[in-house]
């Protein structure tokens, strides 16, 4: 049976993550408050950020910038802005 959490991003009860995917206190906060669906949304945005901004995950500054974007997206409702990207119209 999967665990459920009240997802702060989606503002609803949803399936929680199976295990803590990120280290430290931030990882615990994500595990306790973010659903699988919301984490999937973040992974999509993260991939776009890494590719479009040509981030190097070996660079501590790039990792810190990505972590800041992640916190803003998951907990503060800030959308990820990528210069020159226009989302497809629905």
UniProtKB/Swiss-Prot annotation:
SUPFAM superfamilies reported in the protein's UniProt record: YggX-like (SSF111148)
Disulphide bonds in the chain: none
Any one GO molecular-function label of the UniProt entry: iron ion binding
Gene Ontology cellular-component annotations: cytosol
GO BP: cellular response to oxidative stress
InterPro entries from the UniProt entry: Fe_traffick_prot_YggX (IPR007457), Fe_traffick_prot_YggX_sf (IPR036766)
Alphabetical UniProt keywords: Iron
Pfam family, one: Iron_traffic
Primary role: Could be a mediator in iron transactions between iron acquisition and iron-requiring processes, such as synthesis and/or repair of Fe-S clusters in biosynthetic enzymes.
The family this protein is said to belong to: Belongs to the Fe(2+)-trafficking protein family.
Protein name listed in UniProt: Probable Fe(2+)-trafficking protein
